Amino acid sequence: MSMFKDIPVEVGVIYEGERIRRNDMQVELGGPTVDKKFEIAKVKPMEQIEDGKVFVVGPDLKDLKEGGAYPLGILVEAAGAQLDPGLEGVIERRLHGYLNYIEGFMHLNQRYDVWMRLGKKSFQKGLNSFEVIGKVLYRLFKNELPIIEKLQITFVTDMSKIDELYPQALASYESRDAKARGLKDSEVDTFYGCVLCQSFAPSHVCVITPQRYSNCGAISWFDGKASASIDPKGPIFAIPRGEMLNEEKGEFSGVNEAAKKRSMGEVTKVWLYTAFDHPHTSCGCFEAVTFYIPEVDGFGIVQRNFKGAAVNGLPFSTLADSTAGGRQIDGFHGMSLEYMRSSKFFAADGGWNRVVWVPKEVKEKVKDFIPKDIVDKIATEEDVKSIDELKAFLKAKNHPIVAKWVTEEETPVSASAEDTTPVMTASTLPISAGGFRIILTDAKIYASKVVIKKEETKAEKR
């Protein structure tokens, strides 16, 4: 790109999806070990913007110790005759794509969950100042969003300044989110889709409706509408809702068509209001993961910044890997925290009556949206530490899910002894045969007959 001749590293879409491993990184900015980090966009009057200016408040990249993790705030301030505050979320989310265009720079997540890494090779080439990154962002914003007439960017690493700006950023996010509450999916004829994360999750198509925020928690239905209107060929696009195929599950013909087209046929059916059968795909930037707990037939939820293991013994990273990458995994669902405030929150699965465990921090954030008769019956990490403790807690609190256990226990099952005897059961069971190995963990398999055949190669057939 000719506009980047003075930049010491290459810039282009070819670098989207580039991962920078810990051993290869110069520094980490934000991420799971840093408490306060953010990126925010604000629309300002023309006279308040110094066009093209890049400010660095605090130590610059070259001043940061190699291998360290540091707090970072990014403030993008834009002005233009056609700009209004309703476009702030649109401008802000473009940071994800634009920063990933930079060779040797990785950007993940959004808002207060941002996680960035600068690679050693790019640092050694001269990408050693936020001013260089700011120049790239300025040119990309002005080139791809012409309605931005003036733009300035501020990078903040000074902790006292971050402490000042962080609560302001959180207040801005909440203000945007609140605007979208109240509007229903049934009241609009257009949803919106986003493929910003396809560089990391090729088959992921995020469907944004009034009652279902983007997985990352950064794009509301109003943000999607604004983005599609100013950049109709961009990564956020309109989806005609189409015919309602399944009201309970949240299946729409337009969503299915868009998912199939944008995922290159990998995803053909999406149910928006359930975590089972055809759940919404998960990217990698989601704020939280819902995971099914078969022992209690309920859902647990764990957010990205949760320290330690969830009630099932697994940390967020492992649970995230179980559903990320644009896949549809039964009982696993990457989602935004804002979706937990929606009346369509897993509506087909029982909604909050199906949730049994949530970290205290998340529970406090969404407490006002949990039905009052269930809020104290949902366990947190302070109440239970294991599945057995969770079972006892749910029984003691008379959680609605317990009634379902009783019903299932009392339902007569007609089956032969052959059907109900486990073929195998073990906490970890390795099976080796024919040159391959399968490891089953905490599995009980019931079957009347199991046949495993090794497929013959052409040479063997001859």
For each feature predicted by the language model, list its residue ranges:
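Cysteine-centered metal-binding/redox modules
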Residues: 1-416
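Compositionally biased, non-globular sequence tracts
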Residues: 415-462
